[in-house]
Structure formats: C-alpha cells, structure tokens
A protein has these predicted regions:
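Structural motif
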Residues: 66-68, 107-109, 154-157, 197-200, ...
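A short beta-strand motif characteristic of beta-propeller blades
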Residues: 33-39, 75-81, 118-127, 163-170, ...
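C-terminal motif of bacterial Sec signal peptides marking the signal peptidase cleavage site
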Residues: 17-18
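Blade-level signature of beta-propeller repeat domains, shared across WD40, Kelch, NHL, RCC1
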Residues: 224-248
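Short loop/turn segments that connect beta-strands within beta-propeller blades
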Residues: 71-75, 112-116, 159-163, 201-206, ...
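Conserved beta-strand positions in repeat-built beta-propeller and related beta-rich domains
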Residues: 41, 51, 58-63, 99-106, ...
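A short helix->beta-strand "capping" segment at the edge of beta-propeller domains
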Residues: 24-43
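Beta-rich, blade/repeat-based domains predominating
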Residues: 40-53, 83-95, 126-141, 172-186, ...
Length: 248
C-alpha cells in the first residue's frame, strides 16, 4: 500500500476551549482538524486510553505514579496511586480493568479501575533507565498487549500471561512515543514526538497514511474511530488535544 504523506498546513487553530482559558496555536496536516485543547490538572501526563464505553479517558502521570480517569475534556473524575515510578503508558483492557507501563522496571502492571493490583509481568528489554518501553495498548481481538520501545522502535506483543509472542522493528520515525490498537478497524496508530507525526498502520505494519502536527512533546494517543476523533496529550504543556481525522 502506498502511504499518503500529507503536507503540514501552517495555520494556527485554537480549538474549542473553556471561556478564559489560554490556548496555544496548533498546526496540522490537511487530513487532521483540531477541535479543542484543554488544560489538565495532571503533572506530566504520559499515556492515554479511551474507556470501553467511550465516555471517559484514562491517563497516567510519569511524575507522581498516579492513574487518572477524566471526562473527554480532561476533567479528573477519579484517581488512584500505583506506587510505581516513571509511568509511560496506560491501556483499557475492559470496562473494569486497565494496565499501565512502568518504564524503569520494564513492567506491565494490571489494576482494577478502583486501583486494586491484579497482576504484573516483565517485558523482555534490558536496562533500567528511561530509554525503555514508551507505549502500551491492548488488542481485544487477540488478547495481547502491544508495547513499543521509544528509541529502538521495537514493537513487542505479549499474551495475557505476559509471555512474548512476537518482536518486530519499526523504522519509519525518529522515535516512538505511543501506540494504540484500533480494534474496530484492526489497525495500529503510532505516535512519534520527534517526527511530529501520527502513523496509521495495518497489523502487518504496512503504512496506510500519516498525520502531521506541531503539538509539543506528544506522549499519548487514543482513538474513537466511530466518531473519527483522536485524543493526544502533551507532557510539558499538560494539555489534552482533541482532533478529528480523515482516514479515507
């Protein structure tokens, strides 16, 4: 499949925000439209997942190790502490369960939505620094976790018992900040902060298209394919961005 690589449209789009809230200009490619941007009361948000019912979002902070559930504009609804350091990803497993990615310990840790520890497993990556796994998603079709390594571009799949089932290398971006499985279309979305791009791939890692934006230090992405909505979080800006995408 020949990918469609759009040209970045340098237009300041301010989006729909609460009255009186400061906004920041955002540029996007023509197949991506900014709908809104919202300040988050979450320090260094890193990782993002849409709830199973599409009514809320899950986020983690890599500063305080807390998991947050928010509404679709980023207002905190509930939270729980994990006791973990340097959280970099979160994924919804089902309506009652989420999993987080601990970068330094190279672990996937599963919690109930109320914060009860349910299980944990090691990822087969060496080291204990902050150049490890950066993105986490759950594929309900195969019942596998999908992990992406930030620098090397390793994409690792693990089953529900945390056993590695496959390992592949991504080579199309400067780094790999986040990943999310689109179960509705059986596709993958990969976020690259340094490349300023979001990539849509088949499960066989063939690129279908890409989207460009200058959102600063993007650290998490999740999709609502039914409504053609993309949610992105920025770590240093502590902001949630809502965008509409065109994948035709």
């Amino acid at each position: 499949v020949t990918p469609s690589i759009p040209i970045l449209t340098i237009v300041g789009l301010f989006g729909l925000v609460s009255c009186g809230e400061k906004t920041f200009p955002v540029s996007t490619s023509g197949n991506l439209e900014l709908l809104g941007q919202y300040a988050l009361d979450i320090p260094e948000p890193s990782g993002l997942s849409l709830s199973e019912d599409r009514r809320s979002l899950w986020m983690v902070s890599d500063k305080n190790g807390i998991v947050y559930q928010t509404d679709l504009q980023g207002k905190v609804l509930k939270q729980f502490a994990t006791g973990l350091r340097d959280l970099e990803g979160i994924t919804t497993i089902d309506g009652e369960t989420v999993a987080v990615l601990a970068e330094r310990t190279r672990e996937i840790v599963v919690f109930s939505k109320d914060g009860k520890l349910l299980g944990r497993g090691k990822i087969g990556l060496p080291g204990d620094d902050n150049n490890g796994p950066e993105g986490l998603s759950y594929d309900p079709l195969t019942r596998e976790f999908v992990v992406v390594n930030e620098v090397e571009g390793l994409l690792i799949r693990m089953d529900s018992e945390f056993r590695e089932t496959s390992r592949e290398v991504l080579r199309f971006a400067q780094d790999y900040s986040s990943i999310t499985v689109d179960a509705e279309k059986d596709q993958l979305w990969v976020l690259s902060d340094l490349s300023g791009s979001i990539y849509l791939l088949t499960k066989q890692l063939e690129m279908l298209t890409s989207y460009s934006t200058n959102i600063r230090q993007m650290e998490g992405i999740t999709m609502d394919h039914e409504n053609k909505l993309m949610y992105v979080v920025s770590d240093p800006m502590a902001r949630l961005y809502v965008l509409r995408f065109d994948d035709r």
